[in-house]
């Protein structure tokens, strides 16, 4: 059971190639490092680069912040599948976004920290609360529901 797992250290997580955990690949990767993972919380760090596809006029857009949150969720799912269940990366879908509030947007070369706290997981669905910080400054908060593509009993891929 995942909740009884001994979770990895920050040093181990920082050494992971984030590309192993995500279905997205460059130039669409919006997180740099996975820095904390346990049965409830996932934390990723990201440096905003000027070549990021969601940067406009030197600032990461709101859409970029949302994609960063979604990919933090994906990194959690990817770690669990790759390291615990020895499965390939699974495709996830945003099922719902609620109460997305933007307080500020980060600039290029700034580091943001995204924290996702799982509130409930059932039948391949994860309900979580997320926040994005730059240092001690809150940039965004939201509630997000993620669905993971599952195989059915006949082995046919379905959503």
What is each residue range found by the language model?
Residues 1-22:
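Extreme N-terminal tail/first-helix region
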Residues 2-8, 75, 107-113, 117-159:
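HotDog/MaoC-like acyl-thioester-processing domains
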Residues 11-12, 77-113:
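Hydrophobic beta-strand-centered segment that forms part of the acyl-chain substrate-binding groove
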